[in-house]
């Protein structure tokens, strides 16, 4: 039983390592199965990030305007997860912008190629800008 509880701890640490920039170094061997199993702890990592952002928001709002608080919170959010979600949003939007040729196999291959490309396209950049703007506006609205 002790070995299983240690595995759960490993998986929890892996989820934080994957979804945040919190420096958790794995001092054990990590298998593909371990990485897959860590997904069960993704909500925990998300709740932790949400707690940090909520406490930061409440604290900052005591000292700054809602506009400045919103901007700082968006910055903390991006820094906390290393822009991981924005990169995924950008890649997805770029892939969805690939025009269809009618050949499903070819279109799928092209979309996967675009998603794998490290360059950000116009649609991806627009999606990032809109996502950041909307996050800022939603946070600002909380304190009006």
Give a label for each model feature.
Residues 1-82, 90-109, 117-144:
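Hydrophobic alpha-helical transmembrane segments
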Residues 87:
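Hydrophobic "anchor" residues on beta-strands that sit immediately upstream
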């Amino acid at each position: 039983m002790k070995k299983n509880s240690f595995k759960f701890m490993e998986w929890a640490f892996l989820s934080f390592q994957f979804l945040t920039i919190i420096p958790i170094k794995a001092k054990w061997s990590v298998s593909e199965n371990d990485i897959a199993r860590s997904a069960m702890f993704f909500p925990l990592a998300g709740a932790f990030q949400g707690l940090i952002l909520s406490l930061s928001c409440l604290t900052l709002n005591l000292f700054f305007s809602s506009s400045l608080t919103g901007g700082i919170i968006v910055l903390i959010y991006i820094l906390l997860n290393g822009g991981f979600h924005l990169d995924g949003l950008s890649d997805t939007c770029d892939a969805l912008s690939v025009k269809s040729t009618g050949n499903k196999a070819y279109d799928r291959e092209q979309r996967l190629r675009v998603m794998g490309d490290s360059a950000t396209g116009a649609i991806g950049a627009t999606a990032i800008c809109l996502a950041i703007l909307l996050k800022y506006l939603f946070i600002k609205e909380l304190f009006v």
